[in-house]
Amino acid sequence: MRRVHITVILLAAVIFLLVLHHNILGLSDILKRQNSDTGPLVFQRLESLPDAPDIGPEHGHGEEIAVVIPGVEERLGGLIATINSISSNTKSNVVFYIITTNDTKKHISSWLDGTDLKRVAYKLLTFDARVLDGKVRVDAGAEPVKPMTFARFYLPSLLPGAKKVIYLDDDVIVQDDIVQLYNTPISPGHAAAFSEDCDSVTSKFPVRGGANQYNYIGFLDYKKERIRSLGIKANTCSFNPGVFVANLTEWRRQNITRQLEKWMELDVTEELYSKSLSGNIAAPPLLIVFYRLYSNINPLWHVRHLGSSTGKRYSPQFVKAAKLLHWNGHFKPWGRTSSFPEIWEKWFLPDPSGQFSLIRRHAE
């Protein structure tokens, strides 16, 4: 009798195990079906990563690199060469913001759109010269003041959504990736980075005309009490405002534009600028407002004074190695004579409308 009970118990156990095994197999099938439904969605997402488009700056995407350049009618050849040199040496997402006047916009657009530069991204910004009323002194017999010279003072209002920009004069050629200049470190509390005039690159050579254009005394009249009261030593190294990187967030916070306007207005009534000032009349207020409050640009990213004479102030090897060349001064590379015109001219694109043409000595 006991053996029968044991046999029954064993049979029951076997049946239980068979049922359990069947249920486990069923559950396994269900799980497999569920995995087969959801699996491809998961793994497809992973497998697609290597084929996803690269959106890094080297492919023209990513963070916008805002480059601001003035567009003046009689100097548009310079603007075109600057844009061409930048766009040809970078794959970054560069957008050109061209500050100009209403009567020049059509000419700029037709030139850009009618050449290989139709590929570049650009926006035309209108500068209203009326903001300068009462802020610019006009001396008798002096050359008329060009309003566009002061457009750089108003970058936050011209580009209200921008946080960081590069400003370049139109007599500049860039020979390397502009993103390197854009990535110039700007210290906390500084609204801009400039290139000092006393750096080892530029201070070796004299500047044509005027006083010492490497120090504040070359820009400000130290006979005036208001200038002396600033406590700025006359031999303090100056900087060149033709190339700079601006932190517009900090610029707005410090209200730099209003500070610049204040010194412009004071110059109108008190004549605070140096009488021997040669060149950029926008420099004095910038030098005052940014005194000891700016970061430094790598000197190779602003090799300047190429327009101060027609001679070769730098060796061809050095000019070739420079990241950025600046023909500031009287002798522009699109003019009759200048230094290293062949370097500039390789980036120049002829005007499809024929309104702008190069002036060359051999053309006489």
From Swiss-Prot:
<keyword id="KW-0325">Glycoprotein</keyword>
<dbReference type="InterPro" id="IPR050748">
    <property type="entry name" value="Glycosyltrans_8_dom-fam"/>
</dbReference>
<dbReference type="GO" id="GO:0008194">
    <property type="term" value="F:UDP-glycosyltransferase activity"/>
</dbReference>
<feature type="transmembrane region" description="Helical; Signal-anchor for type II membrane protein">
    <location>
        <begin position="6"/>
        <end position="26"/>
    </location>
</feature>
<keyword id="KW-0808">Transferase</keyword>
<feature type="glycosylation site" description="N-linked (GlcNAc...) asparagine">
    <location>
        <position position="255"/>
    </location>
</feature>
<keyword id="KW-0735">Signal-anchor</keyword>
<keyword id="KW-0812">Transmembrane</keyword>
<protein>
    <recommendedName>
        <fullName>Glycosyltransferase 8 domain-containing protein 1</fullName>
        <ecNumber>2.4.1.-</ecNumber>
    </recommendedName>
</protein>
<feature type="glycosylation site" description="N-linked (GlcNAc...) asparagine">
    <location>
        <position position="102"/>
    </location>
</feature>
<dbReference type="InterPro" id="IPR002495">
    <property type="entry name" value="Glyco_trans_8"/>
</dbReference>
<dbReference type="GO" id="GO:0005794">
    <property type="term" value="C:Golgi apparatus"/>
</dbReference>
<dbReference type="GO" id="GO:0016020">
    <property type="term" value="C:membrane"/>
</dbReference>
<feature type="glycosylation site" description="N-linked (GlcNAc...) asparagine">
    <location>
        <position position="247"/>
    </location>
</feature>
<keyword id="KW-1133">Transmembrane helix</keyword>
<keyword id="KW-0472">Membrane</keyword>
<feature type="topological domain" description="Cytoplasmic">
    <location>
        <begin position="1"/>
        <end position="5"/>
    </location>
</feature>
<comment type="similarity">
    <text>Belongs to the glycosyltransferase 8 family.</text>
</comment>
<feature type="topological domain" description="Lumenal">
    <location>
        <begin position="27"/>
        <end position="364"/>
    </location>
</feature>
<dbReference type="InterPro" id="IPR029044">
    <property type="entry name" value="Nucleotide-diphossugar_trans"/>
</dbReference>
<keyword id="KW-0328">Glycosyltransferase</keyword>
<dbReference type="Pfam" id="PF01501">
    <property type="entry name" value="Glyco_transf_8"/>
</dbReference>
